[in-house]
Amino acid sequence: MDGLEENGSVVQVGDLLPCKICGRTFFPLALKKHGPICQKTATKKRKTFDSSRQRAEGTDIPTVKPLKPRPEPPKKPSNWRRKHEEFIATIRAAKGLDQALKEGGKLPPPPPPSYDPDYIQCPYCQRRFNENAADRHINFCKEQAARISNKGKFSTDSKGKPASRPQYKPSPLKKSNPPGIPSSGSSRLPQPSTTSKTIVGVPTGKASSVNSPLGNKPQTLSPSHRAIAAPQAGANTKARNTTPPSLARNSVAGVLTNKRKTLTENYAARPDGDYTSSVNGGNSKGIEGNSSGHLPKFCHECGTKYPVEWAKFCCECGIRRMIL
């Protein structure tokens, strides 16, 4: 059939024939040209067009490499039969327990615990985890078990008891007491004197020692003077022991009567500001009453040095500071 004329050429119009490769229809003349071309394109693998790379050209956007698909992990075989059997055993055990409770008989033993074989057991705590959790847990549990074992070795002794913390005890101060004065466990408690007694109506600070050479003033010696006076006191006690008991009693009675007279006279003649105060059994003058005396640098009770010149009390034993 003759068709229309285009550019002076005559196009023949006939039956359309389909292509064997792509299935499209062509004229017989066009089909001869299309056949080899279509065969090449079919055999050649066509590349996938990446539109994102074309869009990123000429811009600052970096080209992203396509991610490779991860291989799927192999599927583990399902243990549905074992799970089904465990489920049936659990239901039977529950029914048996209910029946035993109703009848009042002996309770049946509990079913054995079921474990997932896919889980990994920790060798330290005997718990089970999946593969990902087991890798993290086993390392942590290993360090913790080693830390606890080392801590137990140091904290327990051979008997298994925890070691007690050592307590700090300061070294006791050595005091040289005269032989006539008995030593006491606590220096802060008042100690009754063996050679002097307190008179009713007279302040306790008025009491003075029999061995005092002054008579009307309390005996206040520093630690260095005490050490020197100790041998003399020991010699006096030896001399006293050589006298008969009857003479010793008479002499003590005479000394007590003379001491009472001197104490009453001194108490009446002394002004109000110059009195002695008794603090914890120790005779000491008030600092406020008479500030003209000499302040010792060491405590008369425990021998501790005063940290400052204006201290009124000892920082170690708490005894009031004396005035010499």
Swiss-Prot record:
Gene3D superfamilies registered for this protein in UniProt: Classic Zinc Finger
Disordered: annotated span: 43-83, 149-225
Bias type Polar residues, positions: 188-198, 206-223
Zn finger (C2HC/C3H-type) start-end: 15-44, 118-147
Modified residue annotations for Phosphoserine: S222, S291
Assigned keywords, A-Z: Metal-binding, Phosphoprotein, Repeat, Zinc, Zinc-finger
Regions of compositional bias (Basic and acidic residues) in chain numbering: 48-58
Residues reported to bind Zn(2+) 2: C122, C125, H137, C141
UniProt keyword Repeat, yes or no: yes
GO MF annotations in UniProt: zinc ion binding
Cofactor(s), by name: Zn(2+)
One family name in Pfam for this protein: zf-C2HC_2
Protein's name according to its UniProt entry: Zinc finger C2HC domain-containing protein 1A
Organism: Mus musculus
